[in-house]
Amino acid sequence: PIAVAVTNSATHYVLSGYPEDLAAFGVEVAKEHKHQAKLREEKVRGGRVFDPVLEYLDVTLPFHSPLMADAVSQTVSWAEACDIDASHARELAAEVLLNHVDWAARVRALMNSTDPSTLWVLDFGPGTTVGKLFSTVAQGTGVGVVEASTVADRAELSTLETSPERTQNWTRFAPSIIHTSAGDKVRTAFTELTGKAPVLLAGMTPTTVEPEIVAAAANAGYWAELAGGGQVTAEVFDRHVAKLEEELEEGRTVEFNAMFMDRYLWNLQFGGQRIVPKKRASGTPIDGVVVSAGIPELDEAVELIHTLNADGFPYVSFKPGTVDQIRQVVRIAKAVAPTKVLIEVEGGSAGGHHSWEALDDLLLSTYAEVREQPNLVLVAGGGIGTPERGADYITGEWSKEYGRPLMPVDGVLIGTAVMTAKEAHTSPEVKQMLVNTPGIPAKDPNADPFAPLGEQWVPSGQAKGGVTSGLSHLHADIYELENASARCGRLLVRVMKHPEELESRREEIIEALNATAKPYFGDLKTMTYLEWAQRFADLAFPWVDETYADRFLHLLQRIEARVTKQESGEFESLFASRADVESDPNAAIAKLQAAYPQAAELKVTPMDEAWFPVLVREYPKPMPFVPVIDNDLLRWWGQDQLWQSEDSRYSADSVRIIPGPISVAGITTIDEPVADILGRFEQAMVKRVSADSLAADKAAFAELGAATSAEEFIRKSPNISWVGHLMANPAFGTANGDEHYEIRKVGTKGSVEQYDLDIHLDTYWDNDPDGGKSKHAVRDIVIPLNVDGAESGLFPVVDRDRLPEHVYRMLADTAG
């Protein structure tokens, strides 16, 4: 028989038994690993694959095993023969030879009996094994483990001038409560850095492409990410920024979520065209950039951080989804220290495109490495769909089920939960479907003992809890609600993998396409030219993009060229510009028919049929239909397929809806303000931390830097709002009482406190006998500021009423 001899830690065990049994065990482990790896490869479930490392210890006997029961008896017999206490001999022998040793439990019991951060453990040997085993279990508790197994070790200890280093103490990352005029707030490294609650509105297409929901979350004091995936042109971005600036309260800021691996978007937004930094330079209140969909190489990332900081973005975040990517971000943070870097670890239960990595696996594998880097601020997301689950991650209680110390994070990402918010453009029918979708539980018993711990999974190509995992046009896994659109997607994936079925299943494919918001255009060879134009208008109007009208114009001009009686040369078109077709395509078609009645009888030629896909691809914005059934069918259908879920013209059954499978279960309301949704997450954290916090509560003026006064808050604010424009704060980083940057309170108006930031300037004549007083010069620049401690996440705002007097005085000093 094989016995579990020793439990060294939550993940390290020692087995004892006959050599042949242990060898057979190794064979079975390899078989089970192969089976589990196949389940992962086939995307039946995600999480860490069962893959234990087996190593033989250099021993000749199976210690801590029932096989050694006779040896214990023999030891007792020898003890009796030598007149040694037999019961004591039995106890000692059994501990070495027979009994299971739960080393991890014994270490935890020791730490529970005292404050681990004050405990020192001396390892007198032999060797250093015991100290290493102790450190593994005690990781994150602050225990000090000191090697003292050799004379040299002990001699070194006797001459130490400072205390030896301790293991990491993760309790220092535990959240606490601060009492502010805005109410009780949770304090973490994230709130201290940003001044915003540890509940983040994640960037996600399509929900946070539009500015209304982003602005509403920011106005309530939350980190809110504008999704860069939907800012596809400079014109679209300009329009969204204009609306954002209109919706944002003065002193509020948002963040921009950029897709690094999408080279077109990255070049547009931060590469050659730099539309986002240019907007920031003009004062747009965007103060952070989240680099998602890939992690840059080290040198590129370091340069990027420095560039973004210089461009006015004090907050730069990376969004890794694998262990290797997390470690890459750790290296990046180390290279730019002490500059603060945010890391948004996202597990495979996040909505939309997803990995098969479990959030808990990612954190368990890398938490110690992340926490070793003091300038990293840790945010987690993916499957955090309820306020209670969010509180689990903020307090660190999520890790207890794995036998680990508390592993608190500094903030949590919320995405799926806001898809039905009042400010979300999600159509009413889709919102109702989201509420009706049961989703899957975060935790559920699994009959397979080798299944990974952590969250549950929706198998690829199957439906579970009303959610399925399909493939996007990028051939990447994507979560979506189970509906006609998802079923169509599965069929197209099947045909993509078996192209020989394309023709035989053509009618089935067309039927599936026509049940979605992106139907098949139709067989052009069966249509007349007039029917071609009418079908285009029926499927594309109202135009959601101006280039739809451009393509319709070009289609009508093509039809004119075909049906006109003129044989060659140029002719004067009925439709000279977009204005002729934009407002009423049906009127344009009627005009075409009146001028060319033959268009209602002539069939589309093969040449024009071949030209049609070229017209469809004329502009980057895909058309809302599939123009042709060919081997590129999945891309034709899958491109640009998310905006329809925000258009009431389309039924919820026909559109692609992409929530996370776990978080969708937490959606219970329709048209609840996003501030209230995020507020429920925040209040659950406040309640939990208030009950569990080890740290003493403290009073504070604001969350930013846990500032205790308005002056300290002003000096810790990286930006100020100047007449609606975000600009760098000249007093940022200065110490309280700095004589060059004097801050004076000048009044109060309700909850708003009024201050003057007086910047004292040097002049060329300061060393003159009279101190330069006889010379006309600007010796002070005064910036009047308003700060409101009753509002969370609000930066200092320049007082528009008091500003003119200071500007006029400066002009007078300049003019003399």
Language-model-derived ranges and their functions:
Residues 1, 28-49, 80-84, 113-117, ...:
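Alpha-helix termini
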Residues 1-164:
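Acyl-group transfer acyltransferase/transacylase scaffold of fatty acid/polyketide systems
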Residues 8-11, 19-21, 58-63, 126-128, ...:
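Glycine-rich beta-alpha junction loops
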Residues 13-14, 57-60, 95-99, 123, ...:
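Glycine- and other small-residue-rich loops at beta-strand/loop junctions that grip anionic moieties
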Residues 61-64, 125-131, 205-208, 231, ...:
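Gly/Ser/Thr-rich loops at beta-strand to alpha-helix junctions
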Residues 158-171, 195, 247-253, 297, ...:
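Extended charged low-complexity segments that act as oligomerization/scaffolding linkers
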Residues 164-373, 593-816:
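Active-site entrance/lid segments in N-terminal catalytic domains of soluble metabolic enzymes
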Residues 308-480:
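Glycine-rich phosphate/ribose-binding loops and adjacent secondary-structure elements
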